[in-house]
A protein has these predicted regions:
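Internal catalytic domains of large membrane-associated glycosyltransferases
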Residues: 2-101, 106-110, 117-258
Length: 258
């Protein structure tokens, strides 16, 4: 990690939970991205201020079993700091995530592509922990998944970084967002503009190119016109947990769902 990232990380006092909500995703790819993020945070000296949560809403039993198996391997790797010792499918996925994401891009990116409590324990290494939780009933889908985390463990964290299953972010971006949130006590949400990576089809590569060219302009325009306000995009955002829990619970609307 660059010296400036380590310096920023050294000033962070708040505790942040990195949340990865998943639903019948490919476990190796999901865990590979989290390993890449975890390794980058540890190298930045920020491991002690972050925990990772895999929040599973998976309904397919085969995928569920695979999730727990690969999570245990990720736990072992983070616990021992033995990055590069991944096996089989996870090794290939980690190589792709590291090559095309954290180390190569230097920017937040997205690919185009109930175990009780914090089941199974923790993974440490420079203070970074990874937890896995699967809900027996995926009530309210992703929003319900995040709500369940807040109800169980939200009081233990100042901020939460909400990812999508295909999100990949650098320690530099994550540390900077947490530092900005800590320095601005009236900020409720700070979010990063995503970029596509690893696109393969012609259409997806066109989208990736357009996003690379126009994304910074659109982001700057939104920041200018919305000033200190914004809508929540749903991912790649650091959120102040206490404010979120107090203000963002919405009632269930009456009538038939659309």
């Amino acid at each position: 990690a660059a010296p400036k990232v380590r310096e920023m990380a050294s000033f962070i006092k708040a505790k942040t939970a990195v949340l990865m909500p998943i639903y019948n995703e490919e476990p190796a790819q999901v865990m590979a991205r989290l390993l890449a993020i975890g390794e980058d945070l540890q190298q930045a000296g920020a491991g002690g201020r972050f925990d990772i949560f895999v929040l599973s809403d998976t309904t397919n039993p085969k995928i569920w079993v695979k999730e727990e198996k690969i999570w245990l391997e990720a736990k072992r790797i983070l616990e021992s700091g033995s990055f590069g010792a991944e096996s089989g499918e996870l090794r290939e996925s980690v190589a792709g995530a590291v090559e095309h994401g954290v180390r190569a891009s230097g920017a937040e990116s997205r690919s185009d592509t109930e175990a009780a409590g914090r089941s199974g324990g923790t993974a440490g290494g420079a203070g970074l922990h990874i937890y896995y939780r699967r809900r027996a009933q995926n009530t309210a889908r992703k929003s319900g998944n995040i709500e369940d985390f807040c109800n169980r463990w939200g009081a233990e964290y100042d901020f939460m970084l909400v990812l999508d299953a295909d999100s990949l972010m650098t320690a530099e971006t994550i540390v900077k967002m947490a530092r900005l949130m800590e320095a601005n006590p009236h900020a409720g949400i700070i979010q990063a503009s995503p970029q596509m990576i690893n696109s393969t089809s012609m259409f997806a590569r066109m989208q990736q190119f357009a996003g690379k060219v126009a994304g910074p302009v659109v982001g700057a325009g939104l920041a200018y016109w919305q000033a200190g306000n914004s809508n929540y995009w749903g991912h790649n955002a650091v959120i102040r947990v206490k404010a979120f829990m107090e203000c963002c619970k919405l009632p269930v609307l009456k009538g038939r769902a659309p």
